[in-house]
Amino acid sequence: MSLIVYFSSRSENTHRFVERLGMRSNRIPMDGSGGLQVREPFVIVTPTYGGGGSKGAVPKPVIRFLNDESNRSFIRGVIAAGNSNFGEAFCIAGNIISAKCQVPYLYRFELLGTDEDIGNVKNGMERFWTRQTRP
């Protein structure tokens, strides 16, 4: 029950991060075609776009994916990637998705993430899903 749904742009930073996690995952298509349908609980991993503000911070394919009510009903948490050069807007896509979907903002990491980030996310996801499955 530890599904990751993620979006990665042509830079492939988020894709490489998710691959290093070694967890079951589904990728939101880059073209935003909306072809991905999820039928089980998931945590979304997304990059943050834009030059430091909240406008345009969530990638459009992620917005389209979450605008599908069925997909949105299965989101359980969010992890965001970003660039710390953007200061207070670092990983702001996570804040936006967390607030709009009313799910916890679980973690944030810079660019490709570090080995420490990978370990933190793996351990955190295990604890998170264990808590989710308790009665």
UniProtKB/Swiss-Prot annotation:
GO terms of biological process kind: protein modification process
Pfam families the UniProt entry points to: Flavodoxin_NdrI (PF07972)
Disulfide bonds: none
Source species, domain of life: Bacteria
InterPro entries: Flavoprotein-like_sf, RNR_Ib_NrdI_bac, RNR_NrdI
GO terms, molecular function: FMN binding
SUPFAM superfamilies: Flavoproteins
Task of the protein: Probably involved in ribonucleotide reductase function.
NCBIfam families, per database record: nrdI
Family label: Belongs to the NrdI family.
Name of the protein in its database record: Protein NrdI
Organism: Brucella anthropi (strain ATCC 49188 / DSM 6882 / CCUG 24695 / JCM 21032 / LMG 3331 / NBRC 15819 / NCTC 12168 / Alc 37)
Gene that produces this protein: nrdI
